[in-house]
Amino acid sequence: MVQSNNPDSTSRYRTRRSFAKIPAVMDVPNLIAIQTESFKKFMDDGLTNAFADISPIESNTKDMCVEFGKHEFGEPKYSVDECKERDVSYQAPLFAEIRFINRETGEIKEQDVFMGDFPLMTPRGTFIINGTERVVVSQLVRSPGVYFSAERDKTSDKTIYNAKIIPSRGAWLEFETDKRDILSVRIDRKRKQPATLLLRALGIAETREEIIDILGDSEMVIRTLDRDPATTKEESLIELYRRFRPGEPPTIDSARTLLDGLFFNPQRYDLAKVGRYKINKKLEFDPENDASTLTQEDIIATMRYIVGLHDGAEGVQVDDIDHFGNRRIRTVGELIQNQFRIGLSRMERVVRERMSMQEPDDITPQSLVNIRPIVAAIKEFFGSSQLSQFMDQSNIAAGVTLSVVCPHWALAVCLVSAQASKFETFITPTTAACARLRPLKVLTSVLSARWQRMPA
């Protein structure tokens, strides 16, 4: 007799015993571990990282700030079964330690502030939202990093090359060639402009000779320099700001702040560890480089690589976008953390506005924090996101309920609600194909066609 050694499988149910003579090779793994472990990681580290991303929140005059400390959860008001019966959400109150610091006087006020009720995961890896069991499905996305692709131009039949630096959080940076052999840059999917404009704006190179020394004397580099409207760093900053934010009066300081905030501010831009690893590997950088934001070396190496692709250099090649090595899975913990960060960023603007409107002596952490943006962001995710779905359960309960009235109706409902491939042996293939589109109509036809043939 063999007894299962998996503690998860015996914690709530009877021990499964095997009377086979050949022992089991391995125990059945916990099939929902990807859900439970991801949410546990979010509870332990994800919330802390989300608070750290916006802390501290400084006033416009920099004389006051708000800092976030440790956080903790209270006890849920109802159990999982009670939440289902009462049609309420299974959630627990979230409290955060918030400090208000007046830098002029040195005064510090600290309070534990209620940040809203946060949905908790059940032992089954699901969530109870308004009494309904829901599950957050994982998302397959393109992994952060740098990717190079090529395609044929339909009019000129030339090969067009494209390079994308994709972060985990922040603005995309894209380089692309065109049929006129000009290298352009597109920042955060805005209008494209000559790529040399970005080099001058970042202060990497300013003169024509310096840019040629960095990128080489390729014909495409020469053509791009000829199309560049700026010749100095200041002109490049103004031109970049004018194209990125048309209608606003451009200044050098505002343009420099915009550029630094887009790619070099850790609070707004994050490559994540996997993104930095893939950039280091693709561009042959030092593996010890662990910068979470872009560096000037990243931009230079990316431009050199795409120039090499255009010129047919050896050792450079495009990437297969559909390869699973260039994709990753966003699990439930990361998805909720991203949504929680959106709520915090909305709250950040409210806190900054209230600091400028209230008297410093009357300000308390409780009076500054407005939890409505956070609550709304979490509610929006669980209620209307495509990744938050009703728990796909079998119809055992429904079948049992219907079987009390008529077991034949229960069988028909189970057939129609199952996948067509599972009940093609019971009904015709034509009806099975229609079941994917018109389940209620098929249910009627199944009942009318099979009613007489079913045994009493």
Model features per residue range: what roles?
Residues M1-P407, A412-L415, I427, Q452-P455:
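N-terminal non-catalytic structural scaffold regions of very large proteins
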Residues C434-K441, S448-W451:
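Conserved helicase core region in the C-terminal RecA-like lobe
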Residues Q419-F426:
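Short, basic/aromatic recognition patches
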Residues V136, V446-L447:
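Hydrophobic positions within alpha-helical membrane elements
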Residues P93, T431-C434:
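Short glycine-rich loop/turn motifs
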Residues P123-G125, K422, A433-A435:
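Short, conserved secondary-structure segments in the cores of folded domains
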Residues K84, K441-T444:
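Structural and coupling elements of P-loop NTPases
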